[in-house]
């Protein structure tokens, strides 16, 4: 079963588990799955949990790009990056993703939590699903292009939050 979360959410006991398949099997397995994470959700037939996992991941990447835009707009106007990150990570947009990955724009982790390759794989799957299901995914498509740019800049082994660096370079800030 796919999970949503990170090393931190696992340590905090807040991992979310999505399960697809037969309902009877889910009902029997749920107590064991709750040892992995407290939020265990039956989502439907086989494969449906994977669809939701991809939906979660595309939302993470799109949020990271939007957060990056906000930080860089503030920074280019003269507000320090640190102040922008502090305000945004404690504002109405402060989702768990923003709270955990927002500080990455100040210092990337030594080891990627979810690297560019892994995120781009899910973005491409989402875009293909969108085409198949006639669901336009415009922000997913744009965010995917930033992941492609990260690959071109040699940042592929970095956490996908490195899309901030891509946008920063395009904005005349950074390396």
Positions of the model-derived regions?
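Helical "substrate-binding/catalytic lid" subdomain
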Residues: 48-171
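Rossmann-fold dinucleotide-binding core
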Residues: 1-58
């Amino acid at each position: 079963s796919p999970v949503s979360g990170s090393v931190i959410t696992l340590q905090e006991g807040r991992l979310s588990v999505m399960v697809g398949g037969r309902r009877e099997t889910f009902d029997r397995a749920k107590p064991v799955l709750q040892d992995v994470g407290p939020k265990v959700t039956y989502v439907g037939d086989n494969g449906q949990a994977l669809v939701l996992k991809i939906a979660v991941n595309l939302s993470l990447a799109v949020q990271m790009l939007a957060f990056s835009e906000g930080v860089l707009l503030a920074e280019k106007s003269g507000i320090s990056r640190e102040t922008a990150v502090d305000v945004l990570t404690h504002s109405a947009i402060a989702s768990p993703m923003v709270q955990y990955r927002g500080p990455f724009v100040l210092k990337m982790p030594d080891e990627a939590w979810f690297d560019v390759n892994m995120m781009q794989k899910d973005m491409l799957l989402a875009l293909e699903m969108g085409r198949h299901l006639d669901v336009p995914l415009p922000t997913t498509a744009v965010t995917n292009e930033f992941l492609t740019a990260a690959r071109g800049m040699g940042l592929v082994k970095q956490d996908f939050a490195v899309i901030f660096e891509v946008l920063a370079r395009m904005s005349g800030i950074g390396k």
